[in-house]
Amino acid sequence: MNRPALLSAFALAAALLAPAPAHAAGPAATPSTETLSGQPAGQAAPLRVIAAHPVVLGLARQIVKGTPIELVQAAPARLPASRQPAYLAGGKGLDELLAAARQAQAVLTLRSVWPDDQLYPLARRANIHIVEIDAANPIEGELPGIALTESTLREAKGSATVLINQPWQDSANLARMAMIMADSLSRLAPPQRERLQANLAAISQRLQQAQSEASRQLAQADELPVLLLTPRVQALATALQLEPVPWQAPEKDEDLPAALQKAIQAHRPRAILSHTAPDEAAAQAIAAAGVPLIVLRDNAPDPVQALTDAMLAVAQAMARK
């Protein structure tokens, strides 16, 4: 090969091996800019989480406070938890849940202790990738789940058991639920871990302080008689080691005021507990007897505040002479 031909061959080889100019790169050479959520890289949509049970929803609000995590309420606020399964199983409730599930990454449930909680199975119909966070018991088993009372364990697990004898009325159980949710949400949204853990610490501190103060005051009481107006506050009485007096509400509402007066005179409870405010006639009978009425609502917007307020109110009532 003569010298000009050899130089031409070297020039051709160099041209083939040289990197392409920046302006020559076509669309096929550009990496994907789409995330799993369909948003441009660096602009991913915030974590979206579905919840329905009022205590789970209210607790989750406290945990995600100050973060971009979005909570989707799957059932109307005024709908009791006992009616949520039927609402979500069909019609408007199911349609809205499926629509929300398509854009969500996780659901918060109580399925391990409340088998009628079908929020996750229903949401999974619309989104096979959605994750379940069971607030009562972590699936991985790395964190402790909530403790159930002996009476709850004796009965078959079902909707009535856990919704009547509510384990989250024990401050230790409510703190565990918060821990489970915060841990799982931190793993799903790592950039929010610091704020989520700070919110968890604040919740735990509020519950611990209330429990400590309530225990201190209860220790000073010589006896702890309490009248449970409804069975849904049994767990609170058990957690505080109160002494429920013998009592059974009459079948007819119009007989309640007289029955209350009789029970108060016979047993002299230092407080009356209920999960809802009684009607006017019953409230007047309680007020006339001079016994504090303490209401722990199971649909309070902030279940942490509701529980701490109830614990301290009970302790103050028991400690009074």
Can you describe what each PLM-predicted range is?
Residues 8-18:
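Bacterial N-terminal signal peptides
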Residues 2-6, 10, 128:
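Twin-arginine (Tat) signal peptide motif
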